[in-house]
Amino acid sequence: MMSGTGNVSSMLHSYSANIQHNDGSPDLDLLESELLDIALLNSGSSLQDPGLLSLNQEKMITAGTTTPGKEDEGELRDDIASLQGLLDRHVQFGRKLPLRTPYANPLDFININPQSLPLSLEIIGLPKVSRVETQMKLSFRIRNAHARKNFFIHLPSDCIAKDKFFTSSDDPTNLTIPNRDINERTLFLDAFLLCASNNNSNNFKQTYVCNRCINREKRRASRRKSGLNDNSIWQNNENKRAIIFNSKQLFIISNNGLSGNSNCINFDLPTRIVCYCRHHKATNGFVVLFLLRDHNGDILAKTITDPIMIMDKKNASNTTTPTSTSNAQVSPMTNDTRSFSSPQSDLNFPSEFPLPSNSKNFVISTNCMLDSNCNNNNNDNDNKNNIKTNTAMMNNNRHFPSPNSSSEDSNHSFSDIHFSNNNDNNLHRSLDSWSSTGFNSSSNPALTTLTSDFSAASARHTGKRQRSVNEPFMSTPNTFSRLPQKFIDSSKDISNHNSVPVALNNKPSIQRVIPAQGSINGGIEVTLLGSKFKQGLIIKFGENIALSSQCWNESTMVTYLPPSSKPGPVLVTIVDPSETSMRNNSNSSVSTSNSTNDILHLNKYTGEKAIFTYVDDTDRQLIELALQIVGLKMNGKLEDARNIAKRIVGSDSSPSNNNAGLHSQNSSLNSYTNMMRNINDEQLITEVIKSFKRNNNLSTVNLSMCDVRGRTLLHLAAFNNWYSLVSLLIKYGSHLNDQDLFGFTPLHMACINGDLRIIRLLLECNVNIMKKTRNGFIAKQFFLMNYTVNKTRYSNYETSLFDDILTRLTKNTTGSSDTQPFERNVSQSSFNSSLFDDDDADHDYVQERKYLLADSAALAPEQSNCNDNTSFSILDSDSGYDISDCESSSDEIALEFFNTHKIKDFSSKPNEIPKTTKTSIEPDGSLWNRMLTRLNDELPKYEDLFPKKPKNWELGSKSVEIGPDNSAQMTVDDSQTSSEDDELEALQVGFNTIFSKKQNFQNDKMLLFFWIPLTLVLLLCFTLSNLGKDDDMFHNLSKIVQEYLRIGLAKVLLGNERMKTSFKMQLSKFQNNNILNDMRVN
C-alpha cells in the first residue's frame, strides 16, 4: 500500500484520468466517496492530506463551474440506475425521531381550479365499496409532465404505514432533501380524506382517525415482526391521517412508454383507508383530495376522487368496478387488485377462525380438480371458457359455513366447507362430481394434510371432538337402502323434479346437512349447505317443520331440528311459502287445518343426498336428568350424570383385599344386576321419585328442573310414552305449562309422539292448549300432523278416543286461552284425583285400557258441560298451591270424595260452586315456606287477600225470620221502632267493624319496648352533650363510660395478657430524650 501525499495525489490524477477516459462526465460525488475510501484505507495518509485538500478545492471549483449547466451538459445521467445510486447514497430510511408534523387544513385547497395548474393528476382503481382491512392498488397518472422522464415522489409523513419506510431526518418538519439534485427532481404528494357532500358542490367535511380505529390499528401493528415500533406510529402523532400508503416515503418513478405519451408518468401505490364511514356519519362516503407540489411548495396538480364507502361487512355482490377520477378517457386496468388484499378479505368467514397457512395451495388444487372435471365433460373449446369462468367465480364466491356454537351432537371439520356458485351450471356440476368423490388419502394426500390442519385448528377453537378427515362429503351410498318403499317413491319424485335443468337454475337445493344425525327430541343446530337460499324458506325434516331457520347467505342456512315421532332417515326438503298463499289464522279449526295442509302440500325442493337420520336417545336423556335431580338433592349442586351414577353404584369405593370380600362383592353385584334387568327405565325413575315421597323429602326436590334445552322430566316422559311416570309427576306437582327454549309444552310433546292416554290426562288437568311454539304452532296442529295419517291403525276404542280428544281440542280452542288449571274455590282434596289412587299398582297397558273404557263413556259427556274452573285434576304450578296441598288428604279420602261428589253436582249450575266443595282446611305452611318451595308461583290476587262479602251478609249476628202472617199484622209504630233499633244496631256494628279491622303485627312489642326508648335516650344524650357545659356531670360521666368501654373492649378482643404485652411493647418504644434524667438530677 502506498503512503504519503504524493502517492494520494498520483492516485487522484490517475483515477481522474481513467474516469475521464472511460466516460466524459465524471461524477464528483462518486469520485469523492472513492477517494475518501482510498485515503482511509491508506495507512500513510490522513484527512489533512494535501492531496485530499487539493481534491476538496478542486471539487469546489468544479462544482462552481459545472453545476449551472449540469443538466444541459448531461453530467448527471437521467437513468434509473444513476438516480437509484444517488438516492441510496444521500437518503436513509428508518424513523428515529418522534413525528411532529405541522397541521395542514385540506379545506384551504378545495377551491383551487385544477385547470389552472400546470400538471394534471388522475387516480385509477379506486373501488366504490371497500373495507378497512382491504388494501387497494391505486394507479396515479401525471400528465403534462416535464421533459425529464424520471422523478422522485415524496409521500407525506402522516400517511406512512411503517417506521422502516420513513426517511431519516434530523428535522421531520423539514420536507427538503439534503441533496439538491434529488430535491429539484422530487414531486411532493399530499393526500387528505374528506367526507363527501350531498351534491356536486365543494361542501366537504374534514375527517380524522377516531379512537376506536386507532386502537384497532395499534393491535394490527403489534402483530407484525416490528412489534411496538410500528405501534408507536399511532401513539405519538396527533395529525395522523385516515389514508395510509404501504410504500417508502421517497421512491423513483419513470415513464416506460406504457401510456404512449412521453409527457405522462404512471406509478402505483398500495393504499388503505383506516376508518369507517359510519364513524363520521358520512352517508355519501369518503373522497380523497390529492395535491402535487414541487420542491418550492408550489401546487402543480390537484384532483378529488369519486366517493368510496368504507363498510364493516363485505358487499354481497362483488360487482364493484374500479373508477377513474379524471375528465379524460381512462384505459381499462388489467392489474389484479386482489393481490393486495388480505387472505381473509374475500372470504365470508369470521376473524376468530383463522385460515390455514396453505390455503392458497388448496385453492390451486381446487382449480385443478375443476379443470379435470371440465375436461371430462366438455370439449376443448368449451373447457377453456368454462375454466376461466369457474376460476373467476371461485375467486369471487368463496363461502364458508357459519361457525356458530353448535350443539352437543354437531361437529364441524374442514370437509364441511362448500364452495357455492349460483350463476354457472358447469361449475355446479363439477362441484357435485367433486363432492361425491370425497376426501381420500390415497387419491390426494395434499388435501388430506390440509384437511387435518384445518380440523386441528377447529378442534382447538370449539374444544370438541371432530370428525375424521377421511370422512366423505356426503352420506354413505347405501343410505337409501334403509328407507321404506313409500319414502323411496317420494324421493324419486323429488329427484326427478330436481333433474330438470331449468328448475335447478331458479329453485333452492341442499347439498349437505351438518350434522347428518341427531336426537328425535330435536333442539340441536343443523347447518344446511347448498345454493339459491333466501330468507323466509321453510325447512322440513320429513313431515316436521324446523323450529327456526336463518339464512346466512345464498349457500348457508342454519336451522334447529324439530322433534320427530319415530327414529330413522328422513329427507330434508325446502318449502317456498311465496308460491302458495298461506293462511296463518289458527284461531278457527278450518283455517288451522287449511294452513297445515298448505304447508304439507307445497312444492318441496331438495338435493340428491339431503338426508337426516333421527336417533332415539330419549331414555338416556331421561336418566341423565333424573340423576341430576338426585345429585342436586344429595350434594346441593349440579353435577355430571356420570359422576352421580358412579357415586350411587359405589364405583369409587376401594376394593376388598381378601377373597371372601371379593366374592361377597361380586355376588351382591350380580344380584343387583339381575334385579336391574327386571326393572325398566320408567320403573327405575318412578321408584326413585317415590323414595323421596316415602322419606318425606319430596318438598325439597325440584321435579321441574330442566336440561340445557329447557325440557323437564314431564316433557321427556310425555314424549317417550311413559304414562306411569307422567301420572306420578303430575300428582307430585310438576309444572304442566312450562315451555322449553323453543316454546314446547308437555302437551306439545305428547301430541307429537305421546300416547293418547297421556294427551287425555293432560287435557283433564286443564292445561293451556293455546300456547304457541316459537314457530307459531299450537298443540292441535301437531296432533293433526302426526296422527291423521295413522288414524286407521288404532282399534275402535282408540279411534273413538282420538275423536274425543280432537273434539276437546277443537272445543277448547274457541274458549278462553287464559284459563288457569285450578281456581282457589276448589277443594284441596279434589286435587288428589282417583286417577292417581293406585300408586303401587302395576300400570299395565291392559289395565289402563280397561280403566279408560270404564270411565270415558261416563266422564266425557258430563265433563263437556263443566266449567273450566271446576275440573277435578291435580295441582298445576301456575295455580299457586304448595306441593303439600296435593298430599293434604290420603288416597282413601280422595277416592271417597271423588265418588261422593261426582261431576253431576255441578251440572245444575255450572257457574256456582256448591257449598260442599268449600274447604275448611287451613293452608299448610307459612308464607316463607311457600316462598322457598314454590318460587314459580304467581302473586296472589286481590280477591284472595280481601275476599268479597257475600250477598246474604247481614249486619248483626242474629237472623230474624218474619213470616207472611206476622208481616201483615205489623203497625206503623212497630215499624218506626224497628227502624230506629236497626239504625242504632247498624251504628254499633259499624264501630265494631272499624275496630275489628285492626291488624296485629308481630313487631309491635319490639317497637314499643326497644326502638322508641332507645331513640329517646339517644336524643337526650345528644341534647345534653350539645347544650351542657364542658365540666358538668354529664360530660364527666360520658368520659368515664368511654374509658371503661375502651378497656372492656380491649380485654374482650385481646385479653388481659395480650393487653399487658402490647402495653409493655409500647412503653419500650417510648423515647424520653433524657427528660426524666434531667428531672431526677434537679
Swiss-Prot record:
One GO biological process term: silent mating-type cassette heterochromatin formation
IPT/TIG domain: residues covered: 508-585
GO cellular component, one term: endoplasmic reticulum membrane
Record field: compositional bias (Low complexity): 316-328, 376-391, 399-416
Residues that bear Phosphoserine: 468
Annotated stretches, region: Disordered: 315-346, 376-417, 457-476
Gene3D superfamilies tied to this protein: Ankyrin repeat-containing domain (1.25.40.20), Immunoglobulins (2.60.40.10)
Pfam families reported for this sequence: Ank_2, TIG
Annotated InterPro entries: Ankyrin_rpt, Ankyrin_rpt-contain_sf, Ig-like_fold, Ig_E-set, IPT_dom
Keywords from the UniProt entry: ANK repeat, Phosphoprotein, Repeat
Keyword Transmembrane appears in the UniProt entry: no
Spans of repeat ANK: 709-738, 742-771
Alphabetized CDD domains for the sequence: IPT
Feature: compositional bias, Polar residues: 329-346
Misc remark: Present with 432 molecules/cell in log phase SD medium.
Function according to Swiss-Prot or TrEMBL: Dosage-dependent suppressor of Ty-induced promoter mutations. May exert its suppression effect through protein-protein interactions since does not present any of the motifs generally found in transcriptional activators or DNA binding proteins.
Protein name in the entry: Protein SPT23
Species, as recorded: Saccharomyces cerevisiae (strain ATCC 204508 / S288c)
